Amino acid sequence: MCIRDSKLAQHSLELTKQIREKYSFNYDHSSLGTMKIFRDESSFDKASREVERLSNLGLSFKVLTNQEAVEQEPFLSDVSEKLSGGIIFPDDESGDAYKFCKELEKVIREKGGRIHVNTEVKKILFNKRKVNSVVTDRVEIKASRVVLTSGSWTNNLLKNTRLNLPVKPVKGYSLTLDTSILNDTPKMPIIDEGIHTAFTPLGYSLRVAGTAEFAGFNDDIHQKRIDYLYKTLESIYPTISANLDLDKGALWYGFRPMSPDGMPYIGPTKLSGLFVNTGHGHSGWTLAMGSGDVLADLMLKKQPKIEVKPFLASRAV
């Protein structure tokens, strides 16, 4: 998290809590916080200074020695001597993004929203530079306002507009392992800053996510990336790695929509009625609810609840 998007992340977290409590969402969520760990003094000292700057923006954290980090997450005891320290963020939450979306889908349908599944959007039609309709492979939908939330594929729908968002796909992998056979498992999400990998407990599973591959939309699964995830698991949780059936890990990959400055594009474009909400990179769910709220305010010409200038789509389109 950087200073520019910390307010958006905090706003998003609060809205996520409100939605969860209001509709009793179940998505293996945890409110135990998250912890970053560091394996060298230089990166640990640098990160400690950076979070001090964020504290002025309301970010809660605590800098930990390696032993204090183990006290927070005992499963780190196997690697305690390799750690320089950690930083815990007690207000952070985690959960299964897919399950959250399924819960959200139910609420949307219950409130009269329509979701067209297995439907490909072909193009957006305009009349005198104003949105007129959306053409799909099944039906044409009349609309005066359209929001593009198509991630790394956003520019595919901008081809006939002369607009171009500098959003590029960055391929990321995750590996989800069944931990139901274990008597005990880690409780807190751990981010190993040195190897840019996150280890997140999700109910009776442990998800290992990391790597960044700049290869366009190439959907080949590279074995070395998978091997890397297994290797990182062994490097942080050797006991768990030795007791799980690693051959049954569920592999996933996706294309994160990255912007050049790392900030999302939210809001209106130069074409009347056309809005975008994309470019969130690896922070998609972290910023999701806040981004949606900001976008709704902009569409309704209301004052957003946070400063939005750094995120406005108008800086690109």
Predicted segments with their positions:
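Active-site substrate-recognition segment that forms the wall
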Residues: 77, 121-131, 140-272
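Short, conserved active-site loop motifs that form the nucleotide-linked donor/cofactor pocket
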Residues: 112-114, 206, 274
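C-terminal catalytic lobe of FAD-dependent flavoproteins
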Residues: 61, 68, 193-194, 218, ...
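Short loop/edge segments at beta-strand edges and connector loops
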Residues: 65, 117-119, 250
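Helical element adjacent to the flavin cofactor pocket in flavoenzyme catalytic cores
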Residues: 45-57, 77-145
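Surface-exposed helix-capping loop/turn segments at secondary-structure junctions
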Residues: 18-29, 59, 110-115, 163-164, ...
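Dinucleotide-binding Rossmann-like beta1-alpha1 core, especially the glycine-rich loop
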Residues: 1-67
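Short beta-strand to alpha-helix junction loop
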Residues: 5-13, 36-46, 71, 87-107, ...
